[in-house]
């Protein structure tokens, strides 16, 4: 379905503003924040992410706050992003997603950041989910000492923030950070992953 993103005009001295996504019929899809500088008051940073008791869960009961989801030495290639760009598969394509001369390197589209900062730790989560149907929940991408240039090596580190459940899903919140060769934190992602209870053998 076609959607549009609406960004509130920030006050002159503001570092953050509200954003939302709506369908063409006006139905609200999601809300969040966008900002520069300190992001401690972002939409996700201010969520109450206290964990439930893992023993209350049936699917994610072996995951717990602080549990490592692995460290990964990764070369973040621009090849797939350039292919998507050329095929017209990137919404709102920017030249810096392909042209390295603008900022001294190729910058990632949001989908490329997620491809890496989600794509590796999900390998550690997948054995617990097994054949259950997974859904993306909330996502926050932040750049601390960017840019997060492509065609470079990074170390990704990921760990569980908390686990919990709703009537229809079990969910995990986790954080992944990307460090450059000098061990500076360049980027981070907070992700909520949901698993449908009805799709799991643990609920049958």
Task: Annotate each language-model stretch with its function.
Residues 34-140, 200-204:
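Hot-dog-fold acyl-thioester-processing enzymes
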Residues 1-64, 145-204:
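HotDog/MaoC-like acyl-thioester-processing domains
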């Amino acid at each position: 379905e076609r959607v549009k993103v609406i960004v509130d005009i920030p006050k002159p001295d503001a570092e953050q503003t509200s954003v939302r996504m709506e369908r063409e019929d006006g139905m609200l899809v999601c809300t969040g924040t966008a900002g520069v500088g300190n992001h401690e008051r972002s939409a996700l940073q201010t969520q109450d992410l206290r964990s439930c008791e893992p023993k209350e869960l049936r699917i994610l009961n072996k995951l717990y706050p602080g549990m490592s989801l692995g460290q990964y030495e990764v070369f973040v290639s621009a090849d797939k992003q350039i292919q998507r760009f050329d095929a017209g598969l990137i919404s709102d394509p920017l030249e810096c997603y392909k042209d390295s001369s603008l900022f001294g390197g190729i910058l990632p589209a949001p989908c490329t950041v997620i491809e890496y900062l989600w794509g590796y730790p999900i390998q550690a989560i997948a054995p617990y989910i097994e054949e259950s149907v997974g859904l993306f929940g909330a996502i926050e991408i932040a750049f601390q000492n960017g840019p997060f240039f492509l065609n470079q090596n990074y170390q990704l580190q990921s760990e569980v923030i908390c686990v919990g459940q709703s009537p229809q899903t079990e969910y995990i919140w986790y954080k992944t950070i990307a460090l450059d060769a000098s061990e500076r934190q360049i980027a981070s992602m907070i992700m909520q992953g949901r698993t449908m209870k009805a799709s799991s053998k643990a609920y049958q």
